[in-house]
């Protein structure tokens, strides 16, 4: 009996890896045009990082984290998201002390959540995210959203819907909190046990409940927008005005709260409206978190960010019939005939590779016909044939596979010849 993959995980095979590499490369290059730099953090962190950062009333902390004790008895957790770890690193390394602010970072890597596996939702998934720390400007919020939209456009995604909301500052959220408690408390027994627990700890989480989303009280719950103080209203208005200037369309949804406790002021989600995308339409989520750095022992520092699952982006690209990249084909395949040519084959192959030419050869002792079939299977642009006669003359027969044209080239000139042909698109 063969050993199978753990449930909720996947192997990314070579034919698919090109798509992943393409999305990551486009996202990285776009981030760098916006002056964001890469950061890498460990795959596991102290559990406290997530219970304090993400919020102990969230589904992620209560139900979805992969937590274990190491041999020293320390509680560690495979990261379920990227923001808390990035902020922890920001504080540990005192990046807030740099005169170059805001600090703009991007990251990519595997995350882990114990969820029911389905299309676009895995227990191990790859996330790409950005964080901008050190500025409380709504224009920075708009820049982060512009960056997200730019990545999507470069990937060919056009069927998009940006949904935004304001969660306000601490004063606004406290007023909204009290209104939510008053609204839900008389009928809280009709809600699930999670909502009952959240009522006093964080009633905003009730609005994010999947079990009770159809309860009549959900539709009539107090809107956060009615409890924003003057400062929070002005902040949200400035964000909307900047998005208008950037020609970024959006929809305001006062029920959008996001599933993490650290958000305040701006919260947003990017949805796919592509037909056939599936039940889970959320492509990306994010928002502002002005208290998280302080929660981790740093100075009061504002921040904003977003993250998306690469798996979901792939689904969206397929739903929109985007031309997906394929693995790069070979530039050249070396066919050797005879013992001496076979002996010298690795040397010739290495010269080509040293010259930046994607090249390969047979390692199974195949006959010439089978080697030529292999060159065709690998979609090599050129086949280089070397036999005993070619070795004696220090020449190689170069065949252009698309046209069948054959050229005799000195072995010493082979690398430069192929470089010129490839550059010229011949």
UniProtKB/Swiss-Prot annotation:
GO cellular component, one term: cytoplasm
Signal peptide: none
GO biological process: histidyl-tRNA aminoacylation
Record Pfam families: HGTP_anticodon (PF03129), tRNA-synt_His (PF13393)
UniProt-listed Enzyme Commission number(s): 6.1.1.21
InterPro entries xrefs: aa-tRNA-synth_II (IPR006195), aa-tRNA-synth_II/BPL/LPL (IPR045864), Anticodon-bd (IPR004154), Anticodon-bd_dom_sf (IPR036621), His-tRNA-ligase (IPR015807), HisRS-like_core (IPR041715), HisRS/HisZ (IPR004516), HisRS_anticodon (IPR033656)
Cell location: Cytoplasm
GO molecular function, one term: ATP binding
Gene3D superfamilies in alphabetical order: Anticodon-binding domain, Bira Bifunctional Protein, Domain 2
Reactions performed catalytically: tRNA(His) + L-histidine + ATP = L-histidyl-tRNA(His) + AMP + diphosphate + H(+)
The organism's place on the tree of life at top rank: Bacteria
Keyword entries, A-Z: Aminoacyl-tRNA synthetase, ATP-binding, Cytoplasm, Ligase, Nucleotide-binding, Protein biosynthesis
Disulfide bond sites: none
Predominant subcellular localization, coarse grouping: cytoplasm
Coiled-coil region list: none
Similarity comment: family membership: Belongs to the class-II aminoacyl-tRNA synthetase family.
Family matches, as NCBIfam families: hisS
Subunit structure: Homodimer.
Protein name per Swiss-Prot or TrEMBL: Histidine--tRNA ligase 1
């Amino acid at each position: 009996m063969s050993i199978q993959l753990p449930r909720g995980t996947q192997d990314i095979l070579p034919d698919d890896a090109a798509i992943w590499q393409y999305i990551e490369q486009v996202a990285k290059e776009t981030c760098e045009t916006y002056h964001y730099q890469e950061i890498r953090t460990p795959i596991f962190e102290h559990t406290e990082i997530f219970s304090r950062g993400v919020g102990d009333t969230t589904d992620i902390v209560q139900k979805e984290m992969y937590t274990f004790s190491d041999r020293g008895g320390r509680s560690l957790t495979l990261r379920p998201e990227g923001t808390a770890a990035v902020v922890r690193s920001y504080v540990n390394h005192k990046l807030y002390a740099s005169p170059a602010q805001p600090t703009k970072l991007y990251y990519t890597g595997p995350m882990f959540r114990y969820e029911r596996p389905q299309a676009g939702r895995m227990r191990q998934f790859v996330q790409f995210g950005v964080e901008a720390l050190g500025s409380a400007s709504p224009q920075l919020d708009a820049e982060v959203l512009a960056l997200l939209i730019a990545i999507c456009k470069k990937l060919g995604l056009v069927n998009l819907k940006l949904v935004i909301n304001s969660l306000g500052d601490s004063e606004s959220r406290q007023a909204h909190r009290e209104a939510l408690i008053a609204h839900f408390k008389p009928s809280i027994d009709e809600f699930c046990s999670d909502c009952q627990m959240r009522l006093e700890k964080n009633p905003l989480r009730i609005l994010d409940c999947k079990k009770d989303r159809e309860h009549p009280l959900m539709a009539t719950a107090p809107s956060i927008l009615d409890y924003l103080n003057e400062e929070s209203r002005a902040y949200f208005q400035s964000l909307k005005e900047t998005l208008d200037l950037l020609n970024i369309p959006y929809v305001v949804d006062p029920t959008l709260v996001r599933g993490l406790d650290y958000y305040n002021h701006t919260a947003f989600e990017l949805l796919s409206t592509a037909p056939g995308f599936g039940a889970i339409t959320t492509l990306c989520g994010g928002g502002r978190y002005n208290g998280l750095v302080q929660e981790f022992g740093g100075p009061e520092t504002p921040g904003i960010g977003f993250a998306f699952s690469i798996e979901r982006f792939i689904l969206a690209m397929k739903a929109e019939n985007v031309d997906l990249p394929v693995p790069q084909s070979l530039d050249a395949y070396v066919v050797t005939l005879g013992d001496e040519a076979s002996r010298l084959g690795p040397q010739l192959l290495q010269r080509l590779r040293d010259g930046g030419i994607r090249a390969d050869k047979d390692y199974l002792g195949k006959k010439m016909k089978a080697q030529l079939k292999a060159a065709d299977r690998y979609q090599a642009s050129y086949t280089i044939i070397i036999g005993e006669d070619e070795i004696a003359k220090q020449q190689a027969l170069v065949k252009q596979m698309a046209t069948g044209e054959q050229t005799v080239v000195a072995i010493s000139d082979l690398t430069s010849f192929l470089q010129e042909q490839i550059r010229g698109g011949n």
